Amino acid sequence: MDECLPNSCLLGVHLVISTHSGPQIVYHYPPSNTAFLTNNPTKHQHLYGNHANLNKNTSTNKEEKLFNSGSTKTASQIALNESAKSYNTAITPSMTNTNTNNVTLPPTRSHANTVGSQSSIPAATNGVGYRKTDIEDTSRTFQYQETESETSSSGLSDSELSTDYLDISSDSFSISSSLSSSSLSSSPSSSSSSSPPQDGLSRTNSSFQSTDSMSPTSPQMIMENDSISVAESYLDSGTNNKSRAASKRSQNFFHKLSTKKSTDSKTHSPVRKLKSKPSQSTKKGNKLLKNTSNETDGNAFTGSCSISSKKSLSSTGEHNQELRNSSLNDTPGQSPHHYHHRYHHYHKNAATSQRNSHTQYDVEEEDMEVSAMLQDGKISMNEIFFEEENFQDINKILEFDNDFVAEFCSPEREMCNTRFEFTVDNFCFLGLPIHVDSQGRWRKSKHKNKTRSKRSSSTTTNISRKKSIASKISSLSENTLKKVNSGEADTVYDSNIGHEASTDTPNLRINTDVSGNEFEREKEDLGKNMNMFHVCFVMNPHLIEYNKRIDDMYQFVVTRLSLLLRYVQSKTSYISSECHIILKEKERVLKHSKTYQSIRGAGNKGKYLYQRILAKSSLARALTECVDKIQRNEIACLEINDDKVISLQIPIQNEFEKMPNFKLQPVLRGSYLTSILNMKFLEKSSLRIESQNRQNDQAQFSDTNNNIYRFGNNINSTGHCGAANVDDGDDNESNYYCDDNDDLLNYALLLLDEPNNIISSLETFSYQDDIGTIILKHLVRNIQPNIPLRSYRYLITDLLDNPSSLDDLTTETNSLESSILRSCALHLMYWRHARIVIPLSSKYTYIVSPLAPIQGYTIDDYKSTSQNDGNVKKMDDRENNKSGSDRVPLIYQNSMLFRSKFPSLPSLPIFLSLLSTDKPQAYSNIIPSREHKPVYLNALAWLIQYGYVTQLLTFINIRVDKHIKMAVDEDLEKEGFRKTNTARRPSMDYKKTDKKLDDEDGQSRDANASEACSGKNEGMQSNDNNKDVDEKDNENDSRVDDRDDNEIAIADEEEILHFEYDDPEMQHDYTIILEPERATAIEKRWLYRCIYGQPSDIQILFNKLLKYFNGKVPMELVIIKEEISRHDLKKLLNALDKYLIEIHHW
């Protein structure tokens, strides 16, 4: 069993939503195959190593990458740079190669898609870029692309490439085919060349595409800035130059169609030449291509709009110009009905071309945004999942179809809002599905307004929903609005009106608002139809570790993330909005992105798709980061809805109160062996915060400015991991609240890293102007491990400029400064920057830890002792044999660090030998002089930080011997407690007296004696009165006596159960009082007898420290908490050495 080792067993995550049309998978990560994710010898190793070397030495060094916690930050930074580089290199040579001999059609590209070097950006004029095309090498280039496309797969199903989004009828094919048929007849030699068939394209359409695009007289269409300009290629270079100059001067192709006078302009002279073709060939071409279009599916046209179809689209647009001119001239042989029919097709085709142009422009502009986000580190994902040997179809999750996974991850409403655990083969699907209630609410309202009507409530909900949707749409259309307001945007054709829109800015704003309204309506429809969402995690733990791994994942990650998402969904419809963004972006990339279709390889295509989705959706970024960080056993800091921050982690078990059996259950080297557990404070604080959140609905999550309390969302609770309903209001609180006196401010903080590294990490995961971050950085710079936290209240007072009285103890404990200090300490503890210790002192005793990292080569060198996975053991043995001479043992690595940090001190082995003696002694015994004390204390802090040394604490128990018991028994007999009914029940007297004493206070012996005497007199009077009653009363008295005997017998059993280790019958010589603070009456008499005859100062000090003499609280902490001196404590121990037992333990 490896339960003590950090292993999340997490494979991936997927988001499922359920609407009226059924469940569907919105997003899943990673899209890797099952063999790679579940391969134990290499599982997660790429996550720990340096990402920069993965692409270089994937095959040779894949097995040599080990976990190194110290290089996590550097590796993540290098990984971001690699992501940006791989994003640029993922584009095919047809887009980035500057060699004109290898250039592919279409030769014109906007620099928006060219994110590589500056040399790959073509010259641009008026937003349109041109690239020269070598017609002689065209055939060879297309032949190479066709071969490459045949050997590569997109990893997509046919359903992903459907053309439901395009509103193009088969008539549009016939309209756009006249020019291509003419070019077929004019250049038969060009038909031998073929364009590369893209993924999802049929062979028929592919060959047709090539013949049209390879014609020397076919025009080339360049889409840029929502406009379409025509540049025609002719065999005559002079004519070609003139046509290109004319196309540069043109601002919009459809604007030229808006006026009849534009048909006589010079820019349309090439169109007249094209129109002078015989009309018979045009009619034949229309019939031929009409039949061809009926046989081809929608995927064919999508492919024609992807990469090589720029000429085809331009042919369509050019022939629409020709068709409009011929329609406006009303040529003979065409009826008015025929004119209107063709004019209707022109409007429809022009609107479609404009919509495709606008979509393509947005895609190219977003490519640049993705590249910028990659370079800035805003998009991060593990690229090894997208390698060709590891990537799988994006429509599958662990070789299961998306529909199959969506079905069983969408339970009924009665089974939602509780723990979901579904096992398929060796995989466990774990989650917390969130479903709306019968009234359509995501969560119960804490503040119900009974006087409000249902109609007003629904109206308010719709208004708030529209406001939230409008706020998100504004961010999407920000770039478009800027261009509209500056007058740089081009005109947009309005197909609904039937004529072209002018270039005025108000009309453009109206069109922008119309598209925004459509986006808003679709998003609102999805929000209304969605009734369930489920963030489901996939795991594959070992059978022997199944319960622990699953419970930890559910308790620390699944529950917290799902409840936060439910909160933001109920407030702002965040989940439905993000799902709509993901689905629309996925559809745009798969159907309209030429960059996507030009990329070769299924892995590169999938990587580009995920980069585009991550650039758009914050929810996708959060889920991706959560999986990557949890797999690396790191802390995932997720940003939800731009104003909610939550940190998730599965705590690493690196602290133990009892000695672990590390030979059978390996642990991390350098783990801490101590009774001061950090997790106890984190769990206690989490329970307190959750109870506050239950009382105040807006606590923690809604407060975005007071970021100092954000740690409350990060700390994990200790409730049961069962399938308790999340709507239950009861707390499953453990008995942590019983130790409220254990204040965190009585401890000291020991930093686990250099202060500069911690400060840089705080700046990365927090806001720069946050008051909490400022306090944390100031505290990290000044913290010392030998000073309690309560001594740093002056720092908070100086920063907040809020002086307070330090004289009142209540004010000092519950003040704002104290609360901020506790929050800062918990934050540093949760983020693994520090741990709490008892303030270091040279007068305390320290020993070498049994878990000291002496053996092994790294802190995670536990795999060699693994009993579960033979492959891992063999791999580690092979690595050890291959690089045995190059690897340095861990003790010598730390020795070099110790020597560099403390050059004036003995070496690490010698220093440890000084502490490891037969009889533990105070740390001051090894300090040579007073001048060496600061250096030795710093060395002690370093040794505790690396797990070499632990503190030997002192615990005290109270032992009561038989002499104390006999003295108390004699006192009870003198006071008359032993003389009641001794003749009739001699064996019950002692226990009955104990029962009477337990029911009383026991604070004062005199009060107890007087009460006992009064009870005795009343008993004697009752016995005298009983002599005068009749026989019937005597029978009743006997029944009462029998009932008293039964009650006493039951009380005796309870007494025996209460005293687990005590012996009331005094069969043993001594008794240990386990809980002096909750002592019974007889135990209090024993304690009073122990200090009887002692000086008053000893009695006062004993009563003050009595509650700590339970063997659980170390005396080193009591000295700080009660503010007493070691001398007073030593004096007390010497005076009561017969009754106080000292226990030395870690």
UniProtKB/Swiss-Prot annotation:
Q: Which UniProt keywords apply?
A: Meiosis, Membrane, Phosphoprotein, Protein transport, Signal, Transport, Vacuole
* UniProt subcellular location: Vacuole membrane
**Biased composition range(s): Polar residues:** 105-123, 201-221, 237-253, 277-303, 323-334
Q: Which InterPro entries match?
A: HTH_NPRL3, Npr3
Return the Pfam families for the record: HTH_NPRL3 (PF24064), NPR3 (PF03666)
What positions are modified (Phosphoserine)? S76, S486, S987
What is the first-listed, main subcellular location in coarse terms? membrane
Q: Where is the composition biased (Low complexity)?
A: 150-159, 177-196, 304-315
- Its quaternary structure? Component of the SEA complex composed of at least IML1/SEA1, RTC1/SEA2, MTC5/SEA3, NPR2, NPR3, SEA4, SEC13 and SEH1. Forms a heterodimer with NPR2.
The name this protein goes by in its record: Nitrogen permease regulator 3
Query: Lineage of this protein's species?
Result: Eukaryota, Fungi, Dikarya, Ascomycota, Saccharomycotina
